[in-house]
Amino acid sequence: FERFTVWFAKYVLPIVHSKKTILKFLSINDIDEQKKFYRDQWDSRRWRLLFGLASSRLVLKRFARQYSMFTYNKIKTVAVIYRKRLERNLNSVLAKNNFFLHYSLMGRYGEELPLYLQEKEYLHLKEKDLGSILSINTIDLSTYLKSQPANTFSKFNLSDIFEALSPSENDVVWEEIIRTAKNGAVVVYWNNLVKRLYPIQLSAYIKNNEEKAAVLQEKDRVFFYDSFHINTIIK
């Protein structure tokens, strides 16, 4: 996905907007001014055409995302949905402060950096013995969780991983999440193009925090997700 994003910034966007226009867009300090700039100077027919091509189902499936992420997605107008989500995001998040949008439009980060790349946080990570607390596994989540003892994890950050699962596979993963979670563990995840929630038969073990999720989604720098979810595991 990162390579695809750099390709978009390097080869597609310059066909639409000059570097001067891009830098202006990324320097605006006011939401209302940003909305006006997007409406009057950014949202051209050429922008819609090339954004539509670059974020079409065919292109994303071939170059940007794993093919399996589209197995259960039946939406054909993916590009239109993503453009509308971008516009929704620009109504509440300044592009200037959005490192993801900087990367998407420039092909690199500007002054705004993800936390782990900021000097203070980088030095904090550098001081830690990451080898003793971090492990990398290249197996699917269901298999990994089945290999772990019960009551192991306090946090789950699962991105939009449920997107690629069938309803039955989704249920199995949630059963394993509950089994391996400590009481009070927090599970966060996103829905993108496929709606996947925890199975209703497990609702006795799961508490929703929809209000907090809605507040945080308003601040989300990544525009293309549909919804953000926060669940607490109750045992």
Language-model features: where?
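Class I S-adenosyl-L-methionine-dependent methyltransferase module
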Residues: F1-E127
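A short acidic, Gly/Pro-enriched loop at the edge of an enzyme's catalytic core
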Residues: I139-N157
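A short glycine-rich, Lys/Arg-flanked "PGG" loop and its adjoining helix->strand segment in the class I
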Residues: E169-N183
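Conserved beta-strand signature within the Rossmann-like core of class I S-adenosyl-L-methionine
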Residues: K155-N157, N183-K195
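Flexible loop/turn segments at secondary-structure boundaries
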Residues: T143-K146, E163-S166, K195-P199, F223
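A short SAM/SAH-binding and catalytic strip from SAM-dependent methyltransferases
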Residues: F153-S168
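Core SAM-dependent methyltransferase catalytic element
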Residues: N209-K235
